[in-house]
Amino acid sequence: MSTLMLIDDTHDGQRLDNFLISHLKGIPLTRIYRAIRKGEVRVNKKRVNANCRLTIGDLVRIPPLRQTNVKKLLPLDKSLLVSLEMRILFEEADLLVINKPAGLSVHGGSGIDRGLIEALCLRQPKSQALKLVHRLDRETSGCLVVAKKRSLLVALHALLTQRKVVKQYLLLVKGHWKWGKRQVDAPLKKNILRNGERIVKVDETGKMATTLFQPLVSYPFSTLMEARPLTGRTHQIRVHAAHLGHPIAGDKKYGDKVFNREMKMLGLKRLFLHSAGILCRWDDRVLGVCALLDTDLFRFLNFLKRRESQS
């Protein structure tokens, strides 16, 4: 028996194929597109193309399709659920901002059973439309904005494209930063090494990326920095910092092995990169959220400060 779904503001403006993909988990893409082509899927009783844009009030008829290869997720560890609940910095009906812990991927996949989004969906099972407004690397902690409605996702993506979202990061880099405040404009290109590892490099044929760096505190052999990316390329801050000769402490992919080993001996157990704050304005709304450094990074900075005073 077919299912009828009424489109609300959550899916207003979304393509039909993307709408179906998000709702028909476990259905092969080829089957979904075949159902559209053959007219099994109807919008307001009419045949439509896959790129049809849905609007509020549309009635979508979805035929019964056999689900295959649906993966059932095991229950989350209760301690993780409690931890995530405590790390929510701000929440409204259409969005939430969470202080993502280091070591947790934003999405499951590539051998990872479950990521942050999957965990948040289990926290509130009815919120199946949770979408990342932006991304953080697995080992990066801090502010992460999640949209509960597609209309908000589109609005915030537009702000990001227009460079109207201020994102502030804290990072500890190798050496003494000598330039003061500096803007880095260096194109980045994704590459795949012979061993299959994915890596990003500065390359003239890549996409332009811009990052603002500013030194905050100098320590022996390292500097605490603020970084504000004006674009959103993969690994942008990490690659730009390394490109200038100041790789981030604890960065196993782009960092300095000797420096990382020294930092680890002093007590740093992970990448020192933290999304400290985000600020944006749209319509009549303002979103401004800060995330304090995680305890491990805060204690490490205090250790460096004490070590400097004793030397």
Name every feature range the model reports, one short phrase each.
Residues 1-34, 66, 84-86, 204-207, ...:
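Pseudouridine synthases involved in rRNA/tRNA modification
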Residues 195-204:
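Short aromatic-glycine motifs in intrinsically disordered, low-complexity regions
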Residues 96, 225-229:
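Short, well-ordered beta-strand segments enriched in hydrophobic/aromatic residues
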Residues 1-194, 218, 298-306:
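RNA pseudouridine synthases
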Residues 213:
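Long C-terminal interaction/binding lobes of large macromolecular proteins
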Residues 149, 174-176, 216-218, 228-230, ...:
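Histidine- and/or cysteine-centered catalytic micro-motif in compact active-site loops
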